[in-house]
């Protein structure tokens, strides 16, 4: 049994759910998402406005072990989609370093990171990026996985220097600086 999968998923009142065969259509303030339900799982819409997610009973023994491993993962993915459609996911990055700047030009994020050239980052269509100040980037989206992927891609443009404390950091991240060589 999965500790997560047993729990019911509470659906906020601002979302509309519609089940069509193996697809759950989630409509909310931020648009619409189609979640493909694995054919080995069942999904029930409860009367109290929650979802019950469980594996089908008529599975072969060898399949049951695989399903138990996937149950919690599928539950978490569905819960993340529901939370994303109701509230969304937001992460803030800070550029720490002398001369590190960011600007937004149409669908490109232009970063000055101490290189001899500017770095251009193409923004995916389902992600919204804002630059409230020249050293902050706010990333917003409905898919938690996509938001975290974009955050890590932007952070990979400039490796964090643990000796000087420079780089692209998540907001409120405290770096423990390393000591340099001593004579």
Please provide the spans of the model-predicted regions.
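Ribosome-associated RNA-binding proteins
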Residues: 1-183
